Amino acid sequence: MFSAVLALALAFDQQVQVRVGGKPDSTQGQKVLADTIEDGKDKKRERKRIPVTPELEASAFKDPAARALLKQAREARMRQDSALLAYDATAYQRISAGLGFRAFGRDRLLFRTENVSRVRWSRENGAWVDLKGARTVIPMVKHLDDDDDMDPDEMSPIPYYPGREALWIGNGVAKAEVDPEDMIHPLAVGSEAYYRFAIGDSISFKLSDGKVIALRELRIEPRRPNWRLSVGSFWFDVSTGQLVRAAYRMSVEMDIWQVVDEETALDDDDDKPPAAVKAFLSPMRANLEGVTIDYGLYGGRFWLPRAQAAEGSAQVAFMRVPFKMEESFKYASVNGTDSLPKIPAAPQSLRDSLFGDSTHWRGISQEERKRRYKEIEAADSVRHEQEKAARKAQCDTSGTYTQYHSRYNGTVRVAVRMPCDSLALARSKDLPGSIYEPGEELFGTAERDELMKSLGFSLQPGWAPQKPTFHYGLDLTRYNRVEGFSTGLDVRQQLGKGYSVRAEPRVSLADAQLNGELFGSRGNGRRQLDLGIYRRLEASNDYGEPLSFGASLNALLFGLDEGFYYRSWGAELAGSNVGGGGFTWRLFGEHQWNAPVETQWSLANAMNDVQFMPNLEAKEGTIGGAEARYTHTFGLDPEGWRLLTDSRAEAAAGTFDYARGALDMTLSRGLGAGFEAAVTGSGGMSGGSLPPQREWFIGGAHTVRGQRPSLTEPGQVGNSYWLGRGELGKQFTGVRPTVFYDIGWAGDRNDWGHPGRPVSGAGVGASVMDGLFRVDLSRGIYPRQRTLLDLYFEARF
């Protein structure tokens, strides 16, 4: 479940560990053992670094001022200011990840962890970290909140240390030259081969002592679209070259399967991932939508980090994982007079202390290596027991214990002091009031949003078409009563300047049709514009996703296909969020026509002659129009108020003229003792001549449970509708059993105020992981009385 989060973390080289109960499954000795084994393997061939030729250097700078500013920034980046001797700061850190299956759906918090600590650093003694508060919540799986057994390596960032990487790239230690194995640093020596530089805006401000600080922007664009390259806006102090603020993002998203193929080819490795694995876990992408960094001036001289944040998303097959890391720092003093105790030096590694020879382990026999492995494990067990005894002795005398370790490739020795009662960390008054609070003031959200505006459509990688990528898999495969079995191939190519092209040919067997899409897109990492042509099978349903893989399983296995379909071909211009949700719009011109049922085959049909329901008779015509949709989630705390809103509007003219709009709202609230309740209210109205394929339908898992969609039953289809749903549930670990009652109506808009008897149903269900999966056993009340079982994804509650 956490693979998508880890994929995104890998994309920008951040180590994010989320433990659900229990202790870490690795010790220092096991790490030494792993490193030792790794030393025994053949090293892969290194990725070649592009040399900076005179031609590349000449084309790297738009003007001489950009060249001069980059040179100054490089020197400042590696220069250590010996005048900065110490600081005393409070550090806040928050890491959040969500999880969903649809581009449009409720924002679900998969996990959130946060901590606050006092960090005192001195050039002579390293960093002393007093952990003041720490807590983790996993609201989708209640009772698994992990607030104990804190790992000091995962706690509290260090605001500054000699050699710190100012741009938050890599392992935290600045490298003077570009490393082609990592994200290519835009300020490192040799970056001219990968980037182009231009001077941007400039600003200045006056300090209280009358000193004027001048800042200048350096706009950096990669020469080609590649996930290892970033686009960004970087501001520097003109007098010193120190970084003051920055905003950057990946130039394009990371296609993880493409990266795997590239690494396999680089290593001359024939052991490629099986095609079946790719099909099951595709697509697999990660996108770093934006990193913002803000520095503050302290003592009139020292630029120190004040706030930094990274935001992105990952997709692994059907899973969508938005991700955010936020850090902020507040300084009580800089170059204060407080003294810090000396931190003990790092102990000698077990490998060196036990076998202090220079012999490479590949040069010794297999029997000798096995003997050494066992000796390392035994020595590590002894060391671990000694550490436990020392910790117990500290807790018995002071109520706190201190652990010592090295961070950032041994650059900084760190002492972390924390209370022995780990539950006290979760109750700390130093933490924000609620872990579910957005933290606008704490993490400087307004300033971050202002910085992100610089990453607009004008800041893009250069024009350099890349090799196309090919994607197939379960997410492109479906089954329904019109197409039968249908699958497609997704072909994409990055062109540069923010442009890309995408083709998706699709074949279906039952109706013997060839459909497809051809689109050109332009994006800036957060928003995307698409222009293209298409020939599609469309679903009329406003709720649920009848053409998804999950709905296809119901159709294939149980003969249950709740979608109503029609065909269309045309062209459209659309705008959307890259990560899904939020505000989307679409301008279209298309021809629509009927899509008759072409197959009755399903497993239920083969075993018990279960028949699919008939499809609607679509009205043929050509129209042009516009539609918009906006979804938003307010609140993340399952025990507090949460509101999911989904609003839609559409208008078209041509063969038939119409306008339609709908609003869907679900309000939920924890009632205490693990009980939760939710109420849904939804309604839609239309004007003009609404064709059958754009009407509303009542019945099914996403509207009134206990009733199947119907084109003939009263109150189940029309040019207006209303819907109400109520649920009461009790939360257990990962599962929320519920009881529910649904009522709704669809019909002629003139009958809105006197609809007659509405459609209704009631039942019991189970919501897994806060509605990510859902199973309902329902009983129809009106018009049909029958018992139905529904299994589906992405429920409202």
Label each region the model flagged.
Residues 1-14:
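Sec-dependent N-terminal signal peptides
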Residues 628, 764-772, 786-797:
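Outer-membrane beta-barrel "beta-signal"
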Residues 81-83, 208-212, 444-452, 458-468, ...:
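Short loop/turn motifs that connect adjacent beta-strands in outer-membrane beta-barrel proteins
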Residues 90, 245, 500-504, 528-532, ...:
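Residue-level detector of the transmembrane beta-barrel scaffold of outer-membrane proteins
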Residues 226-229, 476-487, 494-498, 503-516, ...:
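Solvent-exposed loop/turn segments connecting transmembrane beta-strands
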Residues 15-231, 250-260, 267-278, 287-289, ...:
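Structured extracytoplasmic
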Residues 238, 290-300:
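Extended lipid/amphipathic-ligand handling interfaces
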Residues 149-160, 165-176, 453-458, 477, ...:
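C-terminal outer-membrane beta-barrel translocator/porin domains of Gram-negative envelope proteins
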